[in-house]
Amino acid sequence: LDGTIHCFGEGLPNQKVHPKSPESVADVQPVATQLAASILQESEVTDGYAVVLGLSNEQLVDELLRTSKLRIIVVDSGSARMNALRQRLMTAGDYSDRLQLIVGNPDSADIPPYIANLIIVSDEASAPMDSGERVKRMFEILRPYGGKACVLTPDGKDAKLLSHASPGTLPGVKT
C-alpha cells in the first residue's frame, strides 16, 4: 500500500502525459484579483489560517490560494455551490491540502477558537454581521494579538458593524 502500481504483461505500455492546462489570465475576473490583493495588503496577513464565511466570490478563494500561503477554511450553507467549487478545483488539479470546504451555517460552524489569522466575510447575505452575537462569534474564531477581520459590507452597513465591533463592546478590538 505504498502507492506503487504493478502491471504484468508483454512489452512496455504507451505512456501518455496529460499536461495541466492553467486557467487563462483572461478567465480570472480583475475584481477578484484586485480584491484578494487589497485584502492581503491591508491585512498584512499572507500565511497562517484564513476563515472565509460565505462564498459569494469563488475566484476570491482561488486568488487567495494562488497569491498567499494561507490555509483557507471556507464555510457556506450552499452545498451545490461548495460542491461545484470542489469539483472545479479537483478537475483543474488545484484542490490542495491548504483548502477546507465546510458546508454549514457560517454563524454556527464548529470552528476552533483563535484559529484564524484572517477572517473574511465575503457574503454578507449568508453571514450577516448585523448582530452583536455574530460579531462576537467572529472574534472568538479570530486569533488574538494580530488577527485581522475583513467584512465586505454593502453600502451603509459599515456603521452598524462598527457599532458591534467597537473597542468598548469587545475588549482588545481596534477598528
Q: For each predicted feature, which ranges?
A:
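Glycine-rich helix-loop-beta junction characteristic of Rossmann-like nucleotide cofactor-binding loops
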Residues: S38-V45, A109
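Blade-level signature of beta-propeller repeat domains, shared across WD40, Kelch, NHL, RCC1
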Residues: L1-H18
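Conserved class I S-adenosyl-L-methionine
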Residues: E44-L65, K69-V74
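Conserved Class I S-adenosyl-L-methionine
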Residues: K157-T175
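Conserved SAM-binding loop
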Residues: L85-R88
